[in-house]
């Protein structure tokens, strides 16, 4: 193996999302919207059971919720997990059925962007925005629309522009100056409804 190849392998790093940390950040951000009184009934949707990205995101969400429960012993905090599917129609059916059976659900956490379909279910049923808190991962048009409508309160942005841009910059610095690359966690960008107008403008420029 050549010296340059050895150097390249020694500086190999990752630019992307730490799934567990991102899930934790999502739940922590959403906790700011939890009702101040009464029981809290949380539902965590694992869209792809057995797949690392979904399981670890869910693990991060549940880690925070368990910590929250331990810190609020004066409140009833219930945490459930469900296979919520990776299809908007299926997610809507499964979570819609769950909400029918459990109308006192406080919040639903998705490990992808499929909570957008749950928002539509709530709207179609005449449920007011914020009655069931919603949050998930990735910025897609459906999610941004539901954030503007008030149904989705928190979303994790993987910041794909940064995922593409930063590795190129690090490769350039390694090649020109011999600088060692670093791991970059791009996946804990928290987006709330107030951010949507700016994001939509930047999306038109290919930056978000």
Q: Across the structure, where does each feature detected by a protein language model lie?
A:
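Flexible loop/hinge segments that line or gate small-molecule binding clefts
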Residues: 1-21, 32, 41, 45, ...
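Short beta-strand elements in bilobed, periplasmic/extracellular small-molecule ligand-binding domains
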Residues: 41-44, 62-88, 187
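Hydrophobic alpha-helical segments within soluble ligand-binding/sensing domains
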Residues: 14-41, 56, 91-92, 139-143, ...
